[in-house]
Amino acid sequence: MAVPPVEMYSGSFWNRMRKPLPLRTQVIRFTVVFVIVSFILAVALQITHERMPDPKVTKPLPDLGFELLTKVPGMYVLADCCIGFLNILSVFTAFKLYLLHRHCVGSGEPELPCNIPGVSRFFLSVWLCKENCRIELRNIHTIAWIRFITSYALLLLFRSAVIVMTSLPAPDDLCQNPPKIENPVKNVILTVLTAGAGSIHCGDLMYSGHTVILTLHLMFHWIYGAMVHWSFRPVVTVVAIFGYYCIVASRFHYTDDVLVAIYLTIATFIAVGHNADGAPWQLQLFIRWWPCCGANSREVTEDSQPVMVAFKSEAAGQSSRKVVDERNH
């Protein structure tokens, strides 16, 4: 049996493991991880569809939310509209966070080739709500994206296991006569490309994927959207609550599916947290060993701190080191 090297138990080894990866590398690699997790979830959805109890034999479970809210079958479409609206608003907020980062580092506001009165100022001006700004603005857009995408990937990966473990009877009308999946590979690809909207899947109940993304947007704007404009918090809160109502009223999910998803999403988003180094170092361990998709060490200045960069001379075949300080440029 091979004996682990002594340095694995030394403080220097774990210090290297805890050293943060460049933020740009984290953005690229965690986005790739999210795509991989999406395929895992797509396969899990297909397994769940095949394992779902026969609706003709097993009736939907008793649900207090179903008893209190009148059934409106088409409301799930409005839930999708809520998600679409929040997607657009989150992209807009992320861009405004990028402008805040540029303002913090002294880059100024970007300019369009052609100036459109009103429009250019609305999109390219820096919005800052000082009452809710308690976070360092440098790299805030990158850190916010890392926090969002890692939280989403963790929740979808856990959901992949949960929906396969226990099969529940479907409460919605669309799955009372579930269609047969003729081409499994095509269905998996459509699930990833359309986020489930263009594929066949029934029985994926515990917990609600719609609620996960609604709550993620809610948490994103509660923390970061409020830094851009004070109105984002109340607007997103109302939209998210209405989306929850649409999910239950349409019988798309049981009430427990929604409640569990809300709790898990909030807990995960808080646990991942906001850190100048990006994702928690434990999560970075899963992408640290990658030989591609970004550098494993900081070769450029991200926080206006001097770093060491190695330059290789092609003529002499030798390496020289140079300290790069952003403040000197």
From Swiss-Prot:
Cytoplasmic side: 1-26, 96-147, 233, 279-329
Topological domains annotated Extracellular: 48-74, 169-211, 255-257
EC number: 2.7.8.-, 2.7.8.27
Bilayer topology: Multi-pass membrane protein
GO biological process terms, semicolon-separated: ceramide biosynthetic process
Catalyzed chemical reaction(s): an N-acylsphing-4-enine + a 1,2-diacyl-sn-glycero-3-phosphocholine = a sphingomyelin + a 1,2-diacyl-sn-glycerol; an N-acylsphinganine + a 1,2-diacyl-sn-glycero-3-phosphocholine = an N-acylsphinganine-1-phosphocholine + a 1,2-diacyl-sn-glycerol; an N-acylsphing-4-enine + a 1,2-diacyl-sn-glycero-3-phosphoethanolamine = an N-acylsphing-4-enine 1-phosphoethanolamine + a 1,2-diacyl-sn-glycerol; an N-acylsphinganine + a 1,2-diacyl-sn-glycero-3-phosphoethanolamine = an N-acylsphinganine-1-phosphoethanolamine + a 1,2-diacyl-sn-glycerol
TM region positions: 27-47, 75-95, 148-168, 212-232, 234-254, 258-278
Disruption phenotype: Elevated ceramide levels and growth arrest; cells were arrested in division but replication of DNA and organelles continued giving rise to cells containing multiple nuclei, kinetoplasts and flagella.
GO molecular function: ceramide cholinephosphotransferase activity; kinase activity; sphingomyelin synthase activity
Family to which the UniProt record says this protein belongs: Belongs to the sphingomyelin synthase family.
Biological function: Bifunctional sphingomyelin (SM)/ethanolamine phosphorylceramide (EPC) synthase with minimal inositol phosphorylceramide (IPC) synthase activity. Specificity is likely to be defined by residues in the lumenal catalytic domain that interact with the polar head groups of the phospholipid donors. SM is synthesized by both stages of the parasite life cycle, bloodstream forms (BSF) and procyclic forms (PCF), by transferring the phosphocholine from a 1,2-diacyl-sn-glycero-3-phosphocholine to an N-acylsphing-4-enine (ceramide) or an N-acylsphinganine (dihydroceramide).
Name of the protein described by the UniProt record: Phosphatidylcholine:ceramide cholinephosphotransferase 3
Organism listed in the record: Trypanosoma brucei brucei
